[in-house]
Amino acid sequence: MSVETFTPTGLEFTHGAAQKVKNLVNEEGNERLKLRVFVTGGGCSGFQYGFTFDEDVAEDDTIVEREGVSLVVDPMSFQYLAGAEVDYQEGLEGSRFVIKNPNAATTCGCGSSFSI
C-alpha cells in the first residue's frame, strides 16, 4: 500500500497587486500592514471575497510574500482560494483587487461573490 501526499496549490499574488499593496502601505506609513484576503458567506452567489489591511498574523495563517509585502489568508478561506490569483486592476469600472478563482463554479457579474 502506498501513501500519497497532497500539497494544495498555492495562491498567486501578482506584481500589480503587490505594487498596489506596497503603495498603500507606504501611504499609511505602517510597514507592519499586510493585505488580508478572506471568504465569507453572502453575496449573490453564496460566498464573497473580502479584503482588509491587518498588522496581525495568526499561527495558522498562510502568508504569500512578493516584492517586500505580504498577503495573508486564514485556513478556512484558504480552502476556497487554493490555486487562485489575487490581482489589482484599473479600468473603466474603477480600480480594485480581484480574484481569479479556478475553484469557483459560478461568479456574479461584479466578481466579488462566487459559488463552489
Curated annotation (Swiss-Prot):
Q: What does the cofactor section's free text say about binding?
A: Binds 1 iron-sulfur cluster per subunit.
Which key words tag this protein in UniProt? Answer: Iron, Iron-sulfur, Metal-binding
Query: For this UniProt entry, what's an example GO CC term?
Result: cytosol
The alphabetized list of GO BP terms reads: iron-sulfur cluster assembly
Report the SUPFAM superfamilies cross-referenced here: HesB-like domain
Annotated positions binding iron-sulfur cluster: 44, 108, 110
| Xref: PROSITE patterns | HESB
Q: One Pfam family this chain carries?
A: Fe-S_biosyn
Concerning InterPro entries, the annotation shows:
FeS_biogenesis, FeS_cluster_insertion, FeS_cluster_insertion_CS, FeS_cluster_insertion_RrpA, HesB-like_dom_sf
The answer, when asked if Metal-binding is one of the entry's keywords, is yes
Q: Which cofactor does it need?
A: iron-sulfur cluster
Q: Which GO terms describe its molecular function?
A: 2 iron, 2 sulfur cluster binding; 4 iron, 4 sulfur cluster binding; iron ion binding
Superkingdom is: Bacteria
Summarize subunit and interaction data from the UniProt record for this chain.
Answer: Homodimer.
Q: What's this protein's function? A: Required for insertion of 4Fe-4S clusters for at least IspG.
Q: Which family does it belong to?
A: Belongs to the HesB/IscA family.
NCBIfam families reported in the protein's UniProt record: iron-sulfur cluster assembly accessory protein, PRK13623.1
Please identify the protein, giving its name as recorded. Answer: Iron-sulfur cluster insertion protein ErpA
